[in-house]
């Protein structure tokens, strides 16, 4: 069984152990392999996400990383949640009973008065874990967290890719659990392609997955014998079986909703969610259900009837780019690799783009690049942001109308075609400033100004 995310988390653990023990990664790998009784090549397969070890081995791996890498409870919890480890809380209690290393238990200062060591560096490519020191709260966070504390709410998180939407969703889910709610997290990217072709298949699979997430007996087949349409069956299954079976409110947290926009049943599915939202006013059972949806696409391009859309109701959160003060804060959290003038230079270049700011500081902290080279090589195809920029360029060149639209933005600061604008905005390439439409940041203006028509 392949699992890339497990491999990334395990790599973080091995890297932390290597730094703490002042050993090479190879030495730590060999030591870990001996501890768990497997060969180093097998351990490397786990790191690469090519195989997933058995639960007992996972326990030993976590124990090693916590003991030797002083990784905190949040790291261990993220790994166990990801693989759906049975008895997760009990295992965490056992491990950290010996090593009191959770964030809450770590002292702010050592007894000798020295400053605490910098936080264990986290990859900018991953979702930011709960209580991570690298998580930056933005204005939308407080709105979302206040909303989820109430009952019967709908929250929409909308914005371009790599804005931290999934990380915010993780924060919302955690707050919901602390408020005594049950959370069912569904990532639409996990659906097989075959499940996204026929409406009947998708609606049944959605019910099956939701039932599995809630650890309830499956009665989907019984519901599908009723002479009803898919929308009515899904609604009945939710209101007559799932919600009544739960002893507390349910948060249905759905990430990557964009996947459904490309299907022929999007109107039926999203219309169903909208009807659940509206039904709270006259049916108490729906007060027991919170809806949280995350999308990178402007929904109005796909859902023609606004009364059938769940994306224009409830609390709509659009995560903002980082402010200069927040970039300064992140620079400090990364042990200040940039001087104050260089932080301003980074902010001017990236405009507070959350992913690119974190990527830059990560590369600097890892000493993969010097500050001067970061700026001088910024728009090179093989530079520090090269992978990110080449990906966008590749996507644009498949759609000539977007190339022309972005060129118009760069040269004339306008984009008369609203559909083109929203597609460029959805890709995170442009922004509005008053009546003008501008490239998202200086980096994009320079890079696409040079390479768009090459």
Predicted feature locations:
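Conserved catalytic segments around the Walker B and adjacent sensor/switch elements
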Residues: 156, 176-195, 252
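The catalytic "switch" region of P-loop NTPases
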Residues: 264-349, 363-366, 373-384
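Short amphipathic recognition helices of helix-turn-helix/homeodomain-type DNA-binding modules
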Residues: 1-8, 12, 55-115
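Mid-core helix/loop region of P-loop NTP-binding domains shared across ATPases and GTPases
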Residues: 211-254, 258-274, 278-290
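A short, Lys/Arg-rich alpha-helix, primarily the initiator
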Residues: 1-31, 35, 59
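Conserved NTP-binding/hydrolysis module of P-loop NTPases
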Residues: 196-219
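Winged-helix-like regulatory helical subdomains adjacent to P-loop NTPase cores
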Residues: 328, 335-434, 442
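Walker A/P-loop-proximal flanking segment of P-loop NTPase domains
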Residues: 108-162, 167-176, 240-241
């Amino acid at each position: 069984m392949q699992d890339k995310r497990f491999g990334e988390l395990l790599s973080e653990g091995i890297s932390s152990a290597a730094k703490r023990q002042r050993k090479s990664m190879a030495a730590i790998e060999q030591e870990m392999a001996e501890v768990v009784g497997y060969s180093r090549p097998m351990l490397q397969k786990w790191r690469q996400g090519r195989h997933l070890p058995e639960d007992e081995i996972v326990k030993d791996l976590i124990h090693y990383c916590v003991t030797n890498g002083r990784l905190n409870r949040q790291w261990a919890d993220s790994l166990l949640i990801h693989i759906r480890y049975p008895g997760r809380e009990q295992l965490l209690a056992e491990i950290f009973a010996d090593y009191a290393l959770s964030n809450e238990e770590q002292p702010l200062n050592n007894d000798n008065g020295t400053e605490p060591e910098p936080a264990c560096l986290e990859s900018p490519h991953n979702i930011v874990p709960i209580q991570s020191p690298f998580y930056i709260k933005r204005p939308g966070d407080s709105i979302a967290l206040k909303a989820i504390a109430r009952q019967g709410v709908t929250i929409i998180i909308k914005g371009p890719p790599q804005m931290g939407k999934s990380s915010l969703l993780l924060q919302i889910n955690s707050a919901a659990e602390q408020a005594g709610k049950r959370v069912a997290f569904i990532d639409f990217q996990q659906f097989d392609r075959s499940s996204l072709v026929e409406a009947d298949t998708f609606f049944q699979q959605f019910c099956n997955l939701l039932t599995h997430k809630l650890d309830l007996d499956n009665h989907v087949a019984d519901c599908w014998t009723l002479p009803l349409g898919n929308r009515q069956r899904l609604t009945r299954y939710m209101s007559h079986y799932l919600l009544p079976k739960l002893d507390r409110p349910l948060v249905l947290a759905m990430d990557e909703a964009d996947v459904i926009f490309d299907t022929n049943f999007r109107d039926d599915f999203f219309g169903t969610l909208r009807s659940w939202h509206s039904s709270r006013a006259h049916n108490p059972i729906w007060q027991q259900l919170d809806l949280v949806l995350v999308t990178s696409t402007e929904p109005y391009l796909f859902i023609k009837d606004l009364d059938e859309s769940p994306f224009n109701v409830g609390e709509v959160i659009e995560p903002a780019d980082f402010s200069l003060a927040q970039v300064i804060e992140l620079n400090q959290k990364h042990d200040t690799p940039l001087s104050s003038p260089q932080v301003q230079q980074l902010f001017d270049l990236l405009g507070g783009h959350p992913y690119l700011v974190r990527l830059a500081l990560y590369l600097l902290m890892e000493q993969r690049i010097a500050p001067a080279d970061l700026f001088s090589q910024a728009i090179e195809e093989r530079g520090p942001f090269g992978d990110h920029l080449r990906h966008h360029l590749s996507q644009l060149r498949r759609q000539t109308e977007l190339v022309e639209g972005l060129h118009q933005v760069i040269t004339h600061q306008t984009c008369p075609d609203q559909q083109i604008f929203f597609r460029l905005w959805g890709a995170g390439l442009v922004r509005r400033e008053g009546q003008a439409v501008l490239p998202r940041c200086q980096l994009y203006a320079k890079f696409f100004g040079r390479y768009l028509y090459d």
